[in-house]
Swiss-Prot record:
Assembly with partners or alone: Interacts with host RIGI; this interaction targets RIGI to proteasomal degradation. Interacts with host EIF2AK2/PKR; this interaction leads to the proteasomal degradation of host EIF2AK2/PKR.
Protein name: Non-structural protein NS-S
GO terms of molecular function: protein serine/threonine kinase inhibitor activity
Annotated organism of origin: Toscana virus (Tos)
Cell membrane keyword on record: no
Cysteines paired by S-S bonds: none
Domain of life: Viruses
Name of one Pfam family that matches: NSs
Length: 316
């Protein structure tokens, strides 16, 4: 199946400012050349695969395919075996009950801020599609497919790219954003691209709810999300950060002599260096710094070497 995003002319008469261009999806659902490399998306419709080798085997996550320059013949649970995390399912279900217009009218900043990813504007379109279409889709529906393809364009930001490139870019963004919230490739396996986006949105909501709760304890809406979301994971991290900040403030208030005594008592490396009679340099040489940076870069490449080049604009 071939599809393209057709950008519509800006509507000058409307006083509404748009962050994203108006567009619709023009796709040909009738003609498809199955002799070319293709992958079946959501067990519903095929797309052409040009940049990866299509393989008929099972692996834990989509990342395991991409790192070997491969793409599964079926992008779904049949060939991607890892199960997406269910930790944020209650939060996702609560978000499904929301209206983005009502959230804007009520000025729920913690929710609106969390829902800005991945498009840059607050949206519940991915949550709505997940619960309305993916869970209850029982037959080949051209309208649902066009809606799915439109969400791929919005999530990836790639208006003039193939569906294959859009899916890979979305998976890249999902893993990068998910990592900030403690989610791994096994939590976001890629067998349901839009479902993974919903999980990351729910994780962002959980984080902002946990950070906002202490300031707005009388907000009933906030209390509901606080009670159903796994906020304990976020709070434990915030406590650790708070301990570090308190420790740093305490050290800043110490005199040089007191801070020396403190590190002599608590830091073995500092104590060994202070008591050592061996003469050595006080800082790394430029050559040592370059080698250290190269080692860090190699470690990074081992984790993200499959990631495609980002688009020609800053990620949202």
């Amino acid at each position: 199946m071939q599809s393209r995003a057709v950008i519509l002319k800006y509507r000058s008469g409307s006083g509404h400012k748009r962050s994203l261009p108006r567009f619709y999806i023009d796709c040909d659902l009738d003609t498809f050349d199955f002799e070319k490399d293709c992958s079946l998306i959501e067990n519903e419709f095929p797309i052409y695969i040009n940049n990866y080798k299509v393989v008929y085997k099972s692996k834990p996550t989509l990342s395991h395919f991409l790192i070997e320059k491969e793409f599964p013949a079926v992008l779904g649970p049949g060939m991607i075996s890892a199960v997406r995390t269910r930790l944020y399912e209650p939060t996702m279900r609560e978000l499904y009950q929301e209206s983005i217009h009502q959230l804007k009218r009520s000025n729920k900043k913690y929710l609106l801020s969390a829902l800005r990813w991945p498009t840059g504007i607050p949206t519940l379109e991915f949550i709505d599609y997940y619960f309305e279409e993916l869970l209850f889709l029982s037959e080949f529906d051209p309208g649902s497919i066009q809606r799915y393809l439109k969400l791929l364009v919005k999530a990836s930001g790639l208006y003039n790219s193939t569906n294959e490139e859009q899916i890979v870019e979305i998976h890249r963004r999902v893993l990068i954003e998910g990592k900030k919230h403690g989610l791994t490739a096994f939590d976001l396996p890629g067998n349901d691209i839009l479902g993974d986006i919903c999980v990351v949105q729910a994780a962002r909501v959980t984080r902002l709810v946990a950070k906002t709760f202490s300031k707005m304890t009388r907000d009933t809406h906030l209390m509901i999300y606080f009670s159903i979301s796994p906020v304990e994971l976020v709070l434990s991290k915030l406590d650790k950060k708070g301990d570090k900040r308190a420790k740093a403030k305490g050290l800043m208030s110490m005199s040089a002599a007191r801070s020396y005594d403190y590190f002599m008592r608590t830091d073995l490396g500092f104590r060994e260096t202070a008591l050592s009679t061996f003469w050595a340099k006080d800082w790394p040489t430029p050559q040592e710094t370059i080698l250290s940076d190269k080692r860090c870069l190699k470690e990074d490449m081992r984790v993200t070497k499959w990631l495609p080049s980002p688009p020609h604009y800053p990620p949202l």
